[in-house]
UniProtKB/Swiss-Prot annotation:
SUPFAM superfamilies: Purine and uridine phosphorylases. Keywords: Cytoplasm, Glycosyltransferase, Nucleus, Purine salvage, Transferase. This is S-methyl-5'-thioadenosine phosphorylase. Substrate binds at M190, D214, Y215, D216. Pathway: Amino-acid biosynthesis; L-methionine biosynthesis via salvage pathway; S-methyl-5-thio-alpha-D-ribose 1-phosphate from S-methyl-5'-thioadenosine (phosphorylase route): step 1/1. The keyword Metal-binding does not apply. Phosphate binds at S13, R55, H56, T88, A89, T191. It is an enzyme of class 2 (transferase). Its main location: cytoplasm.
């Protein structure tokens, strides 16, 4: 039996416009883990069932540390999503990744300090402790669709990259930025973790479209990262992200995901250690 696809889209800075979805219906969802960042907007893109959620709220009022990542992911799961495709603004740590470039990340480094990274925290809904493996960190089949779609529409794309997620809301110091470069990271952002971890725990096929908006602050020449430039670059290039999402969604829906979803479910189930009596 072929699994029906429903795609959750989490929009970051500059990509929270519900107009990309047709036949929109707003859904207020309250989860066991609290209230999501905003209402969820259900509808269709290219005939495919989708749900759009603004990560920071539609008024961009929620700072990265205060996003209820668990509620966001669980709400998408509750509404029947099989996939989550997200956009994220990032700082480039590599000269060859220019502001305005698109990257499809394949790995991450976690430098957050305040965020709950599991649904299995002793609550009455989910028993046990989940030691979810994070290799691969992202759904490679979904990543492949995004990469192939980008090529097909003539959009230049970096086909992999490691993202360092920092706590924020401050930007990195120059010493931190250079340290991340020494670690081999390609990008720095504030939202990918714990989102990517929670999506895997929830058994969802998760992939990200990262846009480089700046060069962070590691370069000796050039302007250091600032909010105005980040927003201006994202606004100038956001159509690249929306075009990629709109064109990729029907390609995702055309594939049979039954085995992929089943394997994800098995990974979650075999990662849970249930309490036992001595």
């Amino acid at each position: 039996m072929v699994s029906k696809v429903k795609i959750g889209i989490i929009g970051g800075s500059g990509l929270d416009d519900s107009q990309i979805i047709e036949n929109r219906t707003e859904r207020v969802v309250n989860t066991h883990f609290g209230i999501p960042s905003d209402v969820l907007i259900e509808g269709k893109i290219a005939g495919v069932d989708c749900v759009l959620l603004a990560r920071h709220g539609r008024n961009h009022s929620i700072m990265p540390s205060n996003v209820n990542y668990r509620a966001n992911i669980w709400a998408l799961k509750t509404l029947g999503c099989t996939h989550v495709i997200v956009s994220t603004a990032t700082g480039s740590l590599k000269e060859e990744i220019h502001p305005g470039d698109i990257v499809i990340p394949d790995n991450f480094i976690d430098r957050t300090t305040k965020r709950v990274q599991t649904f299995y925290d002793g609550n009455e809904l989910l028993s046990g402790v989940c030691h979810i493996p994070m290799e691969p960190a992202f759904c490679n089949r979904t990543r492949d669709v995004l990469i192939e779609t980008a090529r097909g529409i003539g959009l230049g794309v970096h086909e992999k990259g490691t993202v360092v997620t920092i706590e924020g809301p401050r930007f990195s110091s120059k010493a931190e930025s250079n340290l991340f470069r020494q670690w081999g990271a390609d990008l720095v952002n504030m939202t990918l973790v714990p989102e990517v971890v929670l999506a895997k725990e929830a058994g969802l096929c998760y992939a990200a479209i990262a846009m480089a908006t700046d060069y962070d602050c590691w370069r000796e020449a050039g302007e250091d990262v600032n909010v105005a430039d980040v927003l201006a670059t994202f606004k100038k290039n956001v159509t690249k992200v929306t075009d990629l999402i709109i064109n990729a969604i029907p390609k995702v829906a055309a594939l049979d995901w039954s085995d992929t979803i089943e394997e994800l479910g098995k990974t979650v189930n075999t990662s849970i250690m249930l309490p036992h009596s001595n």
